[in-house]
Amino acid sequence: MSSLPFVSDTFAADRWRQMDVDLTDMTFHRLISRGEVDGAPAGEDLPVTRIAFDRPSLRNAFRPHTVDELYRCLDIARCSPDVAAVILTANGPSPKDSGYSFCSGGDQRIRGAAGYQYETTQSSSDDDLATSARRERIEKGRLGRLHILEVQRL
């Protein structure tokens, strides 16, 4: 059972170490060894990370900020030579109805006529500024030729 609020009952918190990343819409953990059972000293990092959507009250619906955080977590895992596997999951259940959901899709509350918009009430962080800077550097003529995976990196 999980001792963390809004985290699945299948999540054993004592087996995971929270990564030192400032997140609001996601959680990011690293699997730790139990000792001889795992073939490594107890408490040592194992080559597995867990990235989870953490908006259970909205059935883990994503918004642009969520996508930015997901990309940041995946990029950290990609750049870590000792990570062999990434588990992508979601936290829950919903406090409203105790239902579980991986991700219900985009949060329609913030979808404008031109698509999904960043919330204006969100405070700007260095990561948000870096994301904005990357968007501005893209040549406008190339936007129509980007692969979906490249778009998600923006």
Residue ranges and their predicted role:
Residues 2-98:
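Conserved CoA-thioester-binding segment of acyl-CoA-metabolizing enzymes
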Residues 72-75, 149-153:
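A generic local structural motif
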Residues 58, 90-152:
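Glycine- (often His-adjacent) and acidic-residue-rich active-site loop
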